[in-house]
Amino acid sequence: MGQYTVSTRKNVRILLVGDAGVGKTSLILSLVSEEYPEEVPPRAEEITIPANVTPEQVPTSIVDFSSVEQTEETLGLEINKAHVVCIVYSVDDDDSLDRITSHWLPLIRSKCNATLEGDAETEAETEAAGEGLRKPIVLVGNKIDLIDYSTMDSVLAIMEDFPEIESCVECSAKTLHNISEMFYYAQKAVLHPTSPLYIMEDQELTPACKKSLVRIFKICDTDGDNLLNDYELNLFQRRCFNTPLQPQILDEVKAVIQKNVPDGIYNDAVTLKGFLFLHCLFIQRGRNETTWAVLRRFGYNDQLEMCQEYLRPPLKIPPGSSTELSHRGQKFLISVFERYDRDCDGALSPEEHKMLFSVCPSSPWSYSTDIRKSCPINDKGWVTLHGWLCRWTLMTLIDVVKTMEYLAYLGFNVHENDSLLAAIHVTRERRIDLAKRQSSRSVYKCHVIGPNGSGKTGLCRGFLVDEMQKLIGKEFKTNVVHCINSVQVYGQEKHLILRDIDVRHALDPLQPQEVNCDVACLVYDSSNPRSFEYVARIYIKYYAESKIPVMIVGTKCDMDERRQDYLMQPAEFCAKYKLLPPHLFSLRTNKKELYTKLATMAAFPHLRHFGLLTEDSKLLWKAGLGLAAATMLGFIVLKTLSAAGSHSR
């Protein structure tokens, strides 16, 4: 799959207006026939120039307007249909030049605003729309063959007062001087407009353009030293223009920057100020297309907003499939982490985390209340590389669109020179896993369900820490819905996501999205005689007839175990429904085998009823070997799961 760049318009529509007799029709006919017409009709018919004969390779329609044959109402319609309007004046007629400001520009503004008023609901919206969406204008001085002076000084003064004027050109329909250039400027005003990039009266970049270029600079600064060295500049050049930067040209560019911006070059590398100056210079010299090529390569549209197609390419996810990070996606995220881990301590401090997402509109999560409490961290409470990848794995499973969006913000498309789809792996459908009796996925979701006070939140948080004793007696004030970490299942790393299902009242029904998962963990407090009844009812109502593996867990097993006030005791209940015996869990005494068992159950979804394990022992043996051929022959699923009784009592 090739690189993705935001596309420009598929066609351009140019409208020519101006006073009678200034030569609008002659300009069109001279362009088409490449000779001056002896007889000129009142108005030329609309013509379309094929893409292969235009400099920008875009089909272009040229429309003539005649006040003799057409009405002002027709003019209004044509103005709104046009992408750019060329106001033609005669260089030997001062009145036609004066009427640019007294008649034509106010008229075009009024026609555009009339359309915007119909779409805007408030006066403020109308004013804002009128300022931001004015029709691009090109001023065309015809009949330059009749004078020996230029009108450019007068025209430049007009341009300062009307920012929608993109460019101006003097030409002659009779001698064909600058005829092609005139229509090229008109195309350019549509495809590579100046106004979104540059404030003419201030001679500087617009805030939106500057913000976009700052983001691009940061993304291209792959070593994070706030400079673009020769390697980074060459990579930037290849990604944007598909060609290397010749050493001589690179030296010349640096010399120009050094001459004009004293601190634009540092240690023979380009600073941010130098980078911004370079693009300002491109625009001042009429090379808008260079800056636009860069912006579009990095996902920006004509309004300097990130294009939705760039952020969210269509991704087909069949029913029963899930989404994971591909190897390339993980590799890219590792490189981003290492770039911003300035002190190389293997973790992101709050400040480093903030700097990392400075190229995004905002962070995808809260550092203090989300990522630090949903994935592994170090002793300082900072997110480790492992935790960083875990959090992205979590987001990719539950909100893959958001993952793609933030990968785009961070520059995946450019660094990997590919579509965002290359960062995502869509797993096969779950029904196929069941049919093949083995799952090839590496990320599983476990719903932890139980009554309030059962200890399910502590069970989830215990998955993130090496020493669970640290959590004893701790109040969990922040309600973190998901916790994610990795476990080894037959020598392969699997990510397990624990979702803490918040149940306010015992009689509240569970929603389908709260029930459906890869494995369910039903939690009761073994020291509370009324706790198991809720778990039993949940199982019978939602899971008894489903294909979802279920493990029943009794927490707080370090306390006195109480007989449950239910028809059956937990062990009897599990035996009746052919489930593994209850796994007794305690933050004080338990190790982490519970999480490995849950992941293993998710990896082998066909073994839902573990009372049938003896019948499936040969199959289980093969499945274990198929999941990880390098695993010792004695390690099979049966050993992992059936040992629940010995480990949990």
UniProtKB/Swiss-Prot annotation:
Biological process according to GO: cellular homeostasis; mitochondrial outer membrane permeabilization; mitochondrion transport along microtubule
Keywords: Calcium, GTP-binding, Hydrolase, Membrane, Metal-binding, Mitochondrion, Mitochondrion outer membrane, Nucleotide-binding, Repeat, Transmembrane, Transmembrane helix
Major localization class: mitochondrion
Pfam families membership: EF_assoc_1, EF_assoc_2, Ras
Residues at which Ca(2+) 2 binds: D341, D343, D345, E352
Ligand binding (GTP 1): 18-25, 64-68, 142-145
Cytoplasmic-side segments: 1-622
Domain EF-hand: 208-243, 328-363
Positions contributing to GTP 2 binding: 450-457, 488-492, 555-558
Recorded topology in the membrane: Single-pass type IV membrane protein
GO MF annotation terms: calcium ion binding; GTP binding; GTPase activity
InterPro entries from the UniProt entry: EF-hand-dom_pair (IPR011992), EF_Hand_1_Ca_BS (IPR018247), EF_hand_assoc_1 (IPR013566), EF_hand_assoc_2 (IPR013567), EF_hand_dom (IPR002048), Miro (IPR021181), Miro-EF-hand_domain (IPR052266), MIRO_dom (IPR020860)
Record-listed E.C. numbers: 3.6.5.-
Compartments (UniProt record): Mitochondrion outer membrane
Family annotation (PANTHER family): EF-HAND CALCIUM-BINDING DOMAIN-CONTAINING PROTEIN 7
Role noted for this protein: Mitochondrial GTPase involved in mitochondrial trafficking. Probably involved in control of anterograde transport of mitochondria and their subcellular distribution.
UniProt record similarity statement: Belongs to the mitochondrial Rho GTPase family.
Protein name: Mitochondrial Rho GTPase
Species annotation: Drosophila pseudoobscura pseudoobscura
Origin organism lineage: Eukaryota, Metazoa, Ecdysozoa, Arthropoda, Hexapoda
